[in-house]
Amino acid sequence: MASLIYRQLLTNSYSVDLHDEIEQIGSEKTQSVTVNPGPFAQTRYAPVNWGSWEINDSTTVEPVLDGPYQPTTFKPPNDYWLLISSNTNGVVYESTNNNDFWTAVSSVEPHVSQTNRQYILFGENKQFNVENNSDKWKFFETFTGSSQGNFSNRRTLTSSNRLVGMLKYGGRVWTFHGETPRATTDSSNTADLNNISIIIHSEFYIIPRSQESKCNEYINNGLPPIQNTRNVVPLSLSSRSIQYKRAQVNEDITISKTSLWKEMQYNRDIIIRFKFGNSIIKLGGLGYKWSEISYKAANYQYSYSRDGEQVTAHTTCSVNGVNNFSYNGGSLPTDFSISRYEVIKENSYVYIDYWDDSKAFRNMVYVRSLAANLNSVKCTGGSYNFRLPVGKWPIMNGGAVSLHFAGVTLSTQFTDFVSLNSLRFRFSLTVDEPSFSIIRTRTINLYGLPAANPNNGNEYYEMSGRFSLISLVQTNDDYQTPIMNSVTVRQDLERQLNDLREEFNSLSQEIAMSQLIDLALLPLDMFSMFSGIKSTIDLTKSMATSVMKKFRKSKLATSISEMTNSLSDAASSASRSASIRSNLSTISNWTNTSKSVSNVTDSVNDVSTQTSTISKKLRLREMITQTEGLSFDDISAAVLKTKIDMSTQIGKNTLPDIVTEASEKFIPKRSYRVLKDDEVMEINTEGKFFAYKVDTLNEIPFDINKFAELVTDSPVISAIIDFKTLKNLNDNYGITRIEAFNLIKSNPNVLRNFINQNNPIIRNRIEQLILQCKL
């Protein structure tokens, strides 16, 4: 039988492992002798966000605890905590803006009775009444709002660690108060925060506000042990030498320069416009069922003005982490259903690849310090009408998500003619109002953005932002770095495959059915299947190897692998059991039959669901228990062979993909039956089920438990002529009991006779199967 090709591929597809391993070793050996490009990321390698030395980050590396520094007077920067370590009693620090803010912190050692002490604050002698009855040090924060005013105690910090903190942030000055280890922050208002300076009389540390939790930890629990050794020597604050430079939005800055190379920093304001792509596929039949509504990558090209310069940009939008939904209105052919529709939600990501014709993208080969910031954008779904032949149409309507910038890397963006070195912006999602529904169905108030109409009639969505990167380029701007065009090979192959799929699908009308039956009866092997493409044996062997490598990853091969594991488990189980029947039951478990029917109720919908699940496994069951009848795989392989011979575009590179796709997608609607005496039980992949007598073709009640037993013990037969066609044939022409048996068993000779007699019912059924052989 023609399905021998599939069994042969399944058997031999794993024999190419050694060949793959040898080829891989050779490839790795070749690639490992490339020249080390130095400390710069290339566009073909990820990740690209990296900084100095071993820290993989593009941002400036700031230490959590910077110091200690020697006592000094300076104007502290905003958003940085000063952590001051007091080693004696007296004034710890003084701070003022000479306008509306004068404050000082003084320390008092433990166990001090109430007494008056003299302190020099801002050059003047001040007297304070102090007391400390605890075992810890006390720090008194005194304050006045004018240069001539009296100081009053505003806050007190009781600490065993002898640390105080001070921060300029948000128009206020923040300090710690309370008692360690539960000290907290409080603030004082000022109208002139930026001009506040500080006189520090002790060693101190600097901590960024982003690490405030660490500062809180140090205040309450003390510094790390390494900071308390005599080997730590405080430095002058001048050694910190922080230079603050705010880059302009759109400019090119020369960072460094040698004779041949220079580092250029590119800062750019950008406008990103993008749109979602989608694909809506309708099933054949009466027009009430849809196969798939899915997201696809979409390109968009546009122009905009940036600082008086006209910029041409190109974006590619794609999604990742989609959620698969489905809707099933019932098992009748006129019941509306969607096998699968995709929705993006909180667990999804949107990727937008951006390129423009500015200098920043001209030599994007070695890049570092890549950073970006983009606005968020809300995407709201529109309406899609499911145009049914009769009745009111269901409408998928609504849905919304908001895109939030989550990162940027380098990427390669493909167009029809060239590949572009681009920036890939990654966006996380949050669901938003409104929810989406399928009007006139039970699907209501779901959240996310479905793929039916994600653009809602808009030509594009738009967001603005900016990016900055440092690129290593040639000193002479006349030199150009070529883009690695080899990465377009797969893109070219995809275009070839799309053209080939269209050709294959159009050839279905040209297949002669009588020749197809004869071809389906031949034992097609790999040589005879592929010999129509190349005449030499060596090239045919090479193609067969390529097909096996691809076929090994197909759904059919994966299912066979899972079945083999289950049979191994069954064998080990049988060796520990005295009952042969238990062995058979265990072996049948891989079909999920026994498990599926164990809790079935009398509900028709439940039985429909179970039979649909079971029927998808019966292809493998039929394949390992080959009968003399014609199978769906025989027809599938025969159609594949015919189309390969007729095709003008098939080649060595496209053949593996086509054969693998054919094994998975040809004839998706399959019916299988088991036969017991004069009783037939039949199910199909759509969840329909029949039980009937051979003599009369009258239906009888379908017993799913009995069906499960028959599947275990009896051969599974492809229902080439299904029950509906048999019934139609008997009602219009009348068939004998022997003819009915032969058609039920898919006897190829009887099928050929009916076709040669131009029986319209049988011919129509075979034509429908051929039309289902689509990619």
UniProtKB/Swiss-Prot annotation:
Pfam family, any one: VP4_haemagglut
Residue positions of motif DGE motif: 307-309
GO CC annotations, alphabetized: host cell endoplasmic reticulum-Golgi intermediate compartment; host cell plasma membrane; host cell rough endoplasmic reticulum; host cytoskeleton; membrane; viral outer capsid
Stretches for region Spike body and stalk (antigen domain): 247-478
Motif (KID motif): 643-645
GO biological process: permeabilization of host organelle membrane involved in viral entry into host cell; virion attachment to host cell
UniProt superkingdom: Viruses
Positions of the UniProt region annotated as Spike head: 65-223
Disulfide pairings: C317-C379
Coiled-coil parts of chain: 483-510
Keywords recorded for this protein, A-Z: Capsid protein, Coiled coil, Disulfide bond, Hemagglutinin, Host cell membrane, Host cytoplasm, Host cytoskeleton, Host endoplasmic reticulum, Host membrane, Host-virus interaction, Membrane, Outer capsid protein, Viral attachment to host cell, Viral penetration into host cytoplasm, Viral penetration via permeabilization of host membrane, Virion, Virus entry into host cell
Site (Cleavage): R230, N231, R240, S241, R246, A247
The protein's name: Outer capsid protein VP4
Organism: Rotavirus A (strain RVA/Human/United States/DS-1/1976/G2P1B[4]) (RV-A)
